Amino acid sequence: TTVAMTGGSGAPDMAAVISAMPDEWYNHIMMPFNDTTSLNTLRDELLERWGPLKMSEAIAYTAFRGTYGETITFGEGRNDFLISCIGTSKSPSPIWEWAASYCGIAAYHLAIDPARPLQTLVLPGILAPAKADRFAFDERNNLLKSGIATHQIQPGDVVAIEREISMYQLN
């Protein structure tokens, strides 16, 4: 049985992180933290960069680990069109590895063809959740309605993107 790590002491100051990337143009940003303060700080920076004065649009990728109910609640608490969050269920891989794999695969393939759908692309290095912890089809559909991107498990316990969406839900 794998248990969650303990002993951490929160997320870093995202304002300091953002100040270190002055006017560099990053199309894809991997966000290893999904606490409200960190996501709001990054969201505000992305909105400023997206605006008419800078026009250096980008999207951030993050992940959320939790039960179906916890993941729905997290998704419904956000409304960010420049952040995409993939639900991990209870995968043994940590969320920062999910976010890195998700961002890396999306960035690579979208640079080749920005209109390419990302479904079925394998997330390298990611371990599948136990069968009892995997989201069912109807649960994954509800996650999408709550602004959470979904994954599927292919034969051999290979994890792949099922549907990539942003966390934007309400206009």
Where are these regions (language model features)?
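Extended basic-aromatic, gly/pro-enriched interface segments that bind polyanionic ligands
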Residues: 57, 66, 70, 76-171
